[in-house]
Amino acid sequence: MYSLLETINSPADLRRLPRAQLKALADELRAYVIDSVSQTGGHLSSNLGTVELTVALHYVFNTPDDRLVWDVGHQTYPHKILTGRRERMGTLRQLGGLSGFPRRDESEYDTFGTAHSSTSISAALGMALAAEFKGENRNAVAVIGDGSMSAGMAFEALNNAGVHDHCKLLVVLNDNDMSISPPVGALNRHLAQLMSGRFYASARHVGKKVLQVAPPLLELARRLESHAKGMVVPAAVFESFGFNYIGPIDGHDLESLIPTLENIRHLMATGAGPQFLHVVTKKGQGYKLAEADPIAYHGPGKFDPSMGLQKSSAPAKQTFTQVFGRWLCDMAEHDPRLVGITPAMREGSGMVEFHKRFPKRYHDVGIAEQHAVTFAAGMACEGLKPVLAIYSTFLQRGYDQLIHDVALQNLPVVFALDRAGLVGADGATHAGAYDIPYLRCIPNMGIACPADENECRKLLTTAFEQDSPVAVRYPRGAGAGVEPEAGLKSLPFGKGEIRREGSGIAILAFGTLLYPALQAAEKLGATVVNMRWAKPLDTELLLKVAAGHEVLVTLEEGAIMGGAGSAVGEALQAAGVVKPLLQLGLKDEFIEHGEVAVLLALQGLDAAGIEAAVRSRFGSFKSTDPLAKVMLKSVA
């Protein structure tokens, strides 16, 4: 079934194949991707769209000596298969297995780690100029999708690259949404090869020299050339940055891709400066179900390729994302000032229904987190109530805007932080581990940490009622299964509650780890406090609990350093209270991909781990004796 693919263990093997066999290899590669993802889950549509492009790039360029940088990186399964990792695809996105994204420590062919968008051009330009500085003859290639081109960082890199006339940089725009280009055909293929050819480049260069003596003629020539290209391709914007624009061409046509890339490689060798190749691909290419619904097959779980995705017959728990989506629609019905904003994450953030029902109040700003935050600030200035739905890890990209444009002006923006805490198979790049530390230090900022689905809905309402910025952080997937109450009830701002009365030890839980804390407390005989807010901290409740207990434990699904536990320590110190304090949370390390439950256990944040950590630090005691004295083994 994979007779050709099984002979390819590196791009060097690929480059030894006759060109006539590449189409058959691409077909096998596509089938292998479908088979692999069906068994492990993962990104599918985007990978099916890059099969031929991946084959062509590795065939033409001398990787890994030539640097190949993939933007975002979820479309690199064909790249992984061709670079010696075919046999490990069964471990994809599993604990100890292959990452779903490029990793420098995984392969020398993964020249730059990616998972967040729009970084590839900057990285590839840095590599190209470093090679030039060191006197090394190598090329750098950045592959970036049309969605990623909406981020300002991509254009900052283009702007910088354009001033380096001789750098060996190629930017490949993988246009898989047809959002930029018109349909392509034979004329476009011919023009692309012509524009990347030696005669065209030479004639263009010589013509400019000749016309230097007659500036008006030079300007006329520029206009004529631009007009001729403009009839077929959107060249002007990229050439204005100093790139030689080529395309668009069919990204699934190897007979077009390979000669065009060979021509570009020659141009780079002759010092022609940065090159820009526009290819048009189709998400889900070659698998009809994914072609018909590329969004559904963007990141599927395991499935039968012959049947496609099947709806589960068992009723699923409501996810936090769904809780948010329903609250958003209900609050929009209640308050006409509400506007919803997303940076290109409509489905992932649960805003599909809101978009359908309130299209004029829905704003997808594209992959542009910095803009999204300040855009929300501008709306808040005019009396609207913006709700920005964004993954915790992506809000990091708009941090200056969060401080300067929102918090400094104390504007009432609600940040619905999805994917807070561990995210499972997507791993360290997508984990929402740092939002409490990076938000807690900002004046005027509130941070709510709901323990379950019902609290999530209520705390979203509380956040919306404030006249200051508030973030509500909640994890991926389902929680404890607490059904949200109807209506738009709120909870007191900055106030927690005692959920279990015990003695000796008090566990202060922030967020969904309340439930494993309650389980551990049954065996420890401990008090459990549902703190709800990392900021403002309920210091009144904290000091009351501290006065009645011998030791305190904080618990959060976030970084310990600077997190909610640190806030508790600071509050105790400010009040002059000295208590043994154990802070439990995510360790000072990047946490790899795997199942969330397994990762939490490895971090010691399941019920057994919490109990073990408390006993290790403070000694043993019996839950059946509420008056048992806590024996301290060590006190910081």
Curated annotation (Swiss-Prot):
Among the GO biological process terms of this entry, one is: terpenoid biosynthetic process
Q: Recorded E.C. number(s)? A: 2.2.1.7
| Official protein name in the record | 1-deoxy-D-xylulose-5-phosphate synthase
UniProt entry keywords in alphabetical sequence: Isoprene biosynthesis, Magnesium, Metal-binding, Thiamine biosynthesis, Thiamine pyrophosphate, Transferase
Summarizing the function annotation, the protein's role is: Catalyzes the acyloin condensation reaction between C atoms 2 and 3 of pyruvate and glyceraldehyde 3-phosphate to yield 1-deoxy-D-xylulose-5-phosphate (DXP).
Q: Which family does it belong to?
A: Belongs to the transketolase family. DXPS subfamily.
Provide the assembly information.
Answer: Homodimer.
Pathway it acts in?
Answer: Metabolic intermediate biosynthesis; 1-deoxy-D-xylulose 5-phosphate biosynthesis; 1-deoxy-D-xylulose 5-phosphate from D-glyceraldehyde 3-phosphate and pyruvate: step 1/1
Co-factor(s): Mg(2+); thiamine diphosphate
Q: How is the cofactor bound?
A: Binds 1 Mg(2+) ion per subunit.
Residue positions binding Mg(2+): 146, 176
Gene3D superfamilies assigned to the protein according to its UniProt record, in alphabetical order = 3.40.50.920, 3.40.50.970
Residues that hold thiamine diphosphate according to the record = 74, 115-117, 147-148, 176, 287, 369
One of the entry's Gene Ontology molecular-function terms is:
magnesium ion binding
Give the catalysed reaction(s), semicolon-separated. D-glyceraldehyde 3-phosphate + pyruvate + H(+) = 1-deoxy-D-xylulose 5-phosphate + CO2
HAMAP family, per database record: DXP_synth
One GO term describing the cellular component: cytosol
The protein's matches in CDD domains, at most eight in alphabetical order, are given as:
TPP_DXS (cd02007), TPP_PYR_DXS_TK_like (cd07033)
- The first-level EC class reads transferase
